[in-house]
Amino acid sequence: MPIRIPDNLPARKTLESEGVVVMDSSRAARQDIRPLQIGLLNLMPNKERTETQFSRLIGATPLQVDLTLVRITDHQSKHTSEDYLKTFYKTWEEVREQKFDGFIVTGAPIANIPFDQLRYWPEMLDIMNWTQTNVHHTMFICWGAQAALHHFHDARRYRMPAKAFGVFRHQILNPRSPWLRGFSDSPMVPVSRYNDIDRTSLGPDLEILIDNPEIGVCLLDDPKHRAVHMLNHLEYDNRSLADEYERDVKAGLDTPVPANLYPDGNPIAEPENHWRSHAHLLFQNWINEIYQTTPYDMAQIGR
């Protein structure tokens, strides 16, 4: 089944060119099924690229999905026009009375700012609490995962000696997890972060599913809060890390070449994607598990 996204969203052309089936409202209305309602709180500067990355993965699942793009209510984007946001996004205040089968909270490039010093932290607290009453299952990603682990579990975040940057092999710790159906034993995962979570601060109600002893925890299951926490970036496209590297080089920053991204480590070559299949598996598993467990009557979500 296809994904339904806002009409005229620029991501549509990219998705259709890749073979992702995109559905308009009239066609969706003719199908006598309840589509899954998925929300995406997009905290990344490049909204269009991020929404395309997630739509690509959600739209490849065999179920009809309605995707709602959500943004922080009182925050002025420096990289996306207000017209674009008003056309394609809803503020969290506009959706806070809605129920969602699934909700995604993205990362954000604010690793150096303490949580309580972030201007929109109070709204983030409200959103995280709201997921416990209005969302059947939530996926928190990178900074979003760090924030949720801090809020729900008082997990300690610390600065690593050097930025973890590249594509790294990880270990599967629980191959029986429904989130990891079809995963190989040692998936490659894109990583781009300065911080890690102190694993000694993780309580017994959290299960580490994917790990790298040197790079840090990758994926955590949080059944108490009906959530998974992805500390890295399986959603990234081929050039996400490469563009970040080239941006830093142009800015004069001493950024290392992303590990295991380029053939023979040569940044002039085109990046090689070693994680695409696992990205699709994770999101297909997530959507399927939501479909199997969410109430048909959305009013029952969170009860």
List the model feature ranges, each with a label.
Residues 1-72, 89, 95, 99, ...:
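Amide-donor transfer/coupling interface in amidating biosynthetic enzymes
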Residues 46, 75, 111-112:
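Active-site loop signature of alpha/beta-hydrolase-fold enzymes
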Residues 50-53, 79-82, 115-116:
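Short, glycine/acidic-enriched capping/hinge loops at junctions between secondary-structure elements
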Residues 70-74, 144-145:
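Short, glycine/charge-rich beta-strand/loop segments that flank catalytic centers
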Residues 73-86:
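N-terminal beta-loop-helix "entrance" segment that forms/cooperates
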Residues 100, 105-174:
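Cysteine-nucleophile active-site neighborhood
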